[in-house]
């Protein structure tokens, strides 16, 4: 649809492996290096990993060289997943919950500014996912904002990227106070970090704590109980930080939201920054040093 390539997962770089087994690091990077927009339905187990589990079978450098795909979590078959590669981000969309499992992108200093404007761009359904599709009417009179996961402010560098950020597969029902307040402040802080460090790798998405969830609209879009965001910066000493924000109107000091990436992985069940060398991944995810993340927009 719309000229995009639609590729069955079994034929696309062997991205998905045996059930509940994460994709290999090399396959993640190969996927990240594809330039076209694609949709990949992740429902078919295929090849085995091309590196033994538990080894640093990776030639990625800790200083950021060869870092294509650092932002991608491990693809899995343990939950409904359609992988959507867009110009400015990659999304794992869940056709059951009607919201993304996660959205990931590489935010560079060059991407935080540009001439692409959000004014006049409507939220619109994503024709690359099967019906029934979420549309903007599902949110009408729901009491929730259409909350971007990859924010429009991170896509000012390109008009197509900006337009794609308004696809409903990049959107979750979000409390209004959170959307315009603490969550918006975190988005602004990420852009400042990208400018300060040259680039960062970001993953965010909904947190579903409960067994049963509130839904909105005729398509029964699931309302998350919280949202997560994890951020990686490379360099001589790679650092990572995680955040959990409850989906409500309560405001807190920024430090109350901070978590290690390991803790966010425990809460969400995702394996973040899966293409990093294992030793680097373990190091940056184990703990967070807030002193290594100077803040300006989070006060």
Mark where each language-model region is.
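Domain-level detector for secreted/extracellular nuclease and nuclease-toxin modules, and
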Residues: 3-8, 15-299
């Amino acid at each position: 649809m719309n000229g995009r390539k639609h590729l069955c997962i079994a034929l696309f770089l062997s991205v998905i492996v045996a059930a509940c087994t994460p994709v290999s690091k090399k396959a993640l990077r190969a996927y990240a290096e594809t330039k076209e927009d694609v949709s990949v339905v992740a429902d078919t187990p295929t090849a085995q990993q091309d590196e033994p589990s538990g080894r640093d079978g990776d030639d990625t450098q800790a200083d950021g060289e060869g870092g294509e795909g650092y932002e991608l979590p491990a693809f899995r078959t343990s939950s409904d997943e359609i992988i959507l590669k867009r110009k400015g981000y990659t999304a794992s969309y869940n056709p059951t919950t009607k919201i993304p499992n996660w959205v990931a992108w590489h935010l560079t200093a060059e991407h935080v500014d540009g001439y692409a404007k959000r004014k006049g761009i409507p939220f619109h359904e994503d024709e690359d996912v099967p019906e029934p599709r979420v549309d903007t009417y599902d949110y009408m009179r729901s009491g929730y904002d259409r909350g971007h996961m990859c924010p429009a402010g991170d896509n000012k560098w390109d008009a197509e990227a900006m337009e794609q950020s308004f696809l409903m597969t990049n959107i979750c029902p979000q409390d209004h106070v959170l959307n315009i307040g603490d969550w918006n402040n975190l988005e602004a802080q990420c852009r400042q970090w990208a400018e300060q460090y040259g680039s960062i790798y970001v993953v965010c998405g909904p947190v579903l704590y409960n067994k049963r969830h509130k839904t909105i609209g005729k398509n029964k879009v699931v309302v998350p109980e919280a949202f997560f965001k994890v951020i990686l910066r490379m360099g001589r000493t790679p650092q990572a930080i995680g955040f959990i924000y409850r989906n409500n109107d309560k405001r807190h000091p920024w430090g109350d939201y901070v978590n290690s990436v390991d803790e966010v992985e425990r809460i969400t069940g995702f394996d973040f920054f899966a293409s990093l060398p294992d030793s680097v991944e373990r190091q940056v995810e184990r703990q967070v040093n807030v002193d290594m993340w100077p803040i300006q927009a989070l006060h």
